[in-house]
């Protein structure tokens, strides 16, 4: 039997992961980054940008459920949602499940990602691009949040790692812009890497976000695709109570929403904010 081709992730120099490639569906350099979508027997369709896995069909539901339902149910009455990035459409898919949301704006820098994912990752977007509440804006996220006249109740930064096009979405200019267009008691969340291996990302985000928000923290989820353990999500708001809502309150909102999830549930919601001691210590050691 012929040996299968292997695709190796290039995020880390000294260690990493590989995927056997059963079939390359698409591989091109877009206007902004190198994009590949291939099939793997264990994880289904896999998308990578600039040598880093972004999503797989097998476990994407964990990431997208936690990035959407945690802030939306914590907020409780979000009407207007902004997604930065998210070109594969799965974040949009999860937001559209909240029937009380009135408008969903997605800002994606790379139109190529959107068009190719609509074709090759249909299970991710599940026709959510056709939702009448949805508006797509092709623009740089930093530019959008600093220029828009719109305001939002929840902002979800579905960014890549802080390299290439995603680097600007970890800057003070971006965080300041998000604060600018976030409504009172609004919530900002962002992908923040695997903290055991990328601890400096969390420390840097915490320091920068603390300049603009009174309550800054993190929550976590175990996502197999993201090598190294537990994925960390940044959380920022000026309503300190929202991070500490009881499981009972979240349970009532969850039941009222009618959501059916595969990973997220109210107990997971509240437990996700419990951080390992090494991360607590690292954050506490930083100058205020």
Swiss-Prot record:
Primary location: cytoplasm
The protein's assembly and partners: Homodimer or homotetramer.
Enzyme Commission identifier(s): 2.5.1.16
PANTHER family (UniProt xref): SPERMIDINE SYNTHASE (PTHR11558:SF11), SPERMIDINE/SPERMINE SYNTHASE (PTHR11558)
Protein name per UniProt: Polyamine aminopropyltransferase
GO BP of this protein: spermidine biosynthetic process
NCBIfam families recorded: MFS_SpdSyn (NF037959), PRK00811.1 (NF002010), speE (TIGR00417)
UniProt pathway: Amine and polyamine biosynthesis; spermidine biosynthesis; spermidine from putrescine: step 1/1
Function: Catalyzes the irreversible transfer of a propylamine group from the amino donor S-adenosylmethioninamine (decarboxy-AdoMet) to putrescine (1,4-diaminobutane) to yield spermidine.
Alphabetized Gene3D superfamilies for the sequence: Spermidine synthase, tetramerisation domain, Vaccinia Virus protein VP39
Entry binding sites for spermidine: 64, 88, 158-161
EC category: transferase
Domain PABS: 9-238
Keywords: Cytoplasm, Polyamine biosynthesis, Spermidine biosynthesis, Transferase
Family to which the UniProt record says this protein belongs: Belongs to the spermidine/spermine synthase family.
Annotated binding of S-methyl-5'-thioadenosine, by residue: 33, 108, 140-141, 165
Coiled-coil ranges per UniProt: none
UniProt KW ATP-binding keyword: no
Reactions accelerated catalytically: S-adenosyl 3-(methylsulfanyl)propylamine + putrescine = S-methyl-5'-thioadenosine + spermidine + H(+)
Places the protein is found: Cytoplasm
GO CC terms: cytosol
GO molecular function: spermidine synthase activity
Active site residues per record: 158
């Amino acid at each position: 039997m012929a040996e299968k081709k292997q695709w190796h992730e290039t995020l880390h120099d000294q260690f990493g992961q590989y995927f056997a490639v059963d079939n390359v569906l698409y591989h091109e350099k877009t206007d902004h980054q190198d994009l590949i979508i291939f099939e793997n027997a264990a994880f289904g369709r896999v998308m990578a940008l600039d040598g880093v896995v972004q999503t797989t069909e097998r476990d994407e539901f964990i990431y997208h459920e936690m990035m959407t339902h945690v802030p939306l149910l914590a907020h409780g009455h979000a009407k207007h949602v902004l997604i930065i990035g998210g070109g594969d459409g799965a974040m949009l898919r999860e937001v559209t499940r909240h029937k009380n949301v009135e408008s969903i704006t997605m800002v994606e820098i790379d139109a190529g990602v959107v068009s190719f994912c609509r074709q090759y990752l249909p299970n991710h977007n599940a026709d959510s691009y056709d939702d009448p509440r949805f508006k797509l804006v092709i623009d740089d996220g930093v530019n959008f949040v600093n220029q828009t006249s719109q305001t939002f109740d929840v902002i979800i930064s579905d960014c890549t790692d802080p390299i290439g096009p995603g680097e600007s979405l970890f800057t003070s200019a971006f965080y300041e812009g998000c604060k600018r267009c976030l409504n009172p008691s609004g919530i900002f969340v962002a992908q923040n890497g695997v903290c055991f291996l990328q601890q400096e990302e969390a420390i840097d985000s915490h320091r920068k976000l603390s300049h603009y928000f009174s309550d800054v923290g993190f929550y976590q989820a175990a996502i197999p695709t993201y090598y190294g353990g537990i994925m960390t999500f940044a959380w920022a708001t000026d309503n300190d109570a929202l991070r500490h809502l009881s499981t009972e309150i979240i349970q009532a909102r969850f039941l009222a929403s009618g959501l059916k999830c595969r990973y997220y549930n109210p107990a997971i919601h509240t437990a996700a904010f419990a951080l390992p001691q090494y991360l607590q210590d690292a954050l506490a050691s930083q100058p205020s």
